[in-house]
A protein has these predicted regions:
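Residue register of alpha-helical TPR repeats
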Residues: 23, 62-64, 69, 107, ...
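Residue signature of alpha-solenoid helical repeat architecture, marking inter-repeat boundaries
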Residues: 19, 58-60, 103, 143, ...
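Eukaryotic all-alpha helical interaction scaffolds
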Residues: 2, 8-12, 32, 45, ...
């Protein structure tokens, strides 16, 4: 289909085709991820042409959220991979706030909370991404990941998405377990 996509003379039809291709590759990468086929998921998401992903805000946010939350990023070291995951999720959160997309605002916060649930990971990001963490309206202390997960829960309640609400509770539980505070 891509080989003959230049046959779409109408700009609106060409944009719709770009949207469909982007959606196809986003969904494909999710399926590969859930099948634990990480390389295939990366290949699928890398098939998305940046200008196509950037043309629709929802797709842009989903693209960056998937890359960060599913670890569909290229990196040479585990530390570099964690930083890239963080950057993708932070971009998702920041862009969602600016564009008023509460669903992705919550997803970005929940993804960041999951990355920082363990004390060692929190310290890692606290030293390497201080400027980003300072953008949130609460102290950057050991409770920071818990607060992020709780804010994500609030967003998902506003959005009334039961699946995401359950995921936020999992993130809160993950933090509490990692800190020996779960009873």
């Amino acid at each position: 289909i891509r080989e003959e996509s230049d046959l779409f003379a109408d700009r609106h039809e060409a944009l719709r085709l770009d949207y469909a291709f982007t959606e196809f590759f986003l969904v494909s990468s999710i399926y590969y991820y859930y099948l634990q086929q990480r390389q295939e998921a990366i290949i699928s998401i890398d098939n998305i042409q940046e200008d196509e992903a950037l043309s629709d805000t929802n797709q842009l946010l989903y693209y960056h959220y998937l890359k960060g939350s599913a670890s569909l990023v290229a990196a040479n070291t585990p530390e570099e991979r964690k930083l890239r995951e963080f950057d993708e999720l932070y971009f998702t959160w920041r862009t969602a706030v600016k564009s008023k997309h509460p669903y992705f605002e919550g997803n970005g916060m929940q993804g960041l909370a999951n990355l920082m649930a363990s004390p060692s990971n929190f310290e890692f990001f606290k030293t390497r991404r201080t400027h980003a963490l300072d953008q949130f309206d609460f102290p950057v202390d050991s409770l920071f990941p818990l607060r992020l997960a709780q804010l994500a829960l609030e967003k998902f309640r506003e959005y009334n998405d039961l699946y995401q609400i359950a995921g936020a509770y999992v993130s809160i539980g993950k933090y509490l377990n990692a800190h020996g505070r779960y009873q």
